[in-house]
Swiss-Prot record:
InterPro entries: FMN-bd, Ion_transpt_RnfG/RsxG. This is Ion-translocating oxidoreductase complex subunit G. Its cofactor is FMN. The gene is rnfG. Part of a membrane-bound complex that couples electron transfer with translocation of ions across the membrane. It is found in: Cell inner membrane. It comes from Haemophilus influenzae (strain PittEE). It is a single-pass membrane protein.
Amino acid sequence: MGTVKITSRYGILLGFIALLCTIISAGIYFLTKDKIDAVIAAQQRELLLQVIPQDYFNNNLLESAVIPQDKNFVGIQKIYFAKKDGNISAYAYETTAPDGYSGDIRLLVGLDPKGEVLGVRVIEHHETPGLGDKIERRISNWILGFTNQSINEHNLSEWAVKKDGGKFDQFSGATITPRAVVNQTKRSALIMLNNQALLQQLSTQVK
């Protein structure tokens, strides 16, 4: 009987400790949530500014995102609409290259409505360190090669790595990774150019 009472007391004590830990954890979360959200928002803004220069827009890019549902936007997860005085001035596409050497490569691609690439950055990848990871800005300048490059019906063949007859450098010992990034940037630009009317419709959902 005494053993049962002791066990019950320990059970109650452990339950109380677990409840107390939960309350403390929840309190810490709510106290720090705003700070964490602010840090994440600042990081997102900084990344967006790397693909759409500030002088292109005066709206809030973080509040201008739309998740496209139309089949014409396959491979595009999110579109940010940059607007200057209410008019569309540029887009930032969150998109995924499915054919990296080690799987998906998530990209952020900035474009103006006429087909000029304003910037490209890698959001996430799993490419080989020392080879494919040169797509990262912190490791090499390769990704800057897209900035101010235009795409149109007359230069589509140029949008490939040099090994495939295009104008973009590949990496020594790692052609698959840069090829995937070039091809997905090209796809994103063509989706933008070929769906202007749909983009105008989507833009009405944001300020």
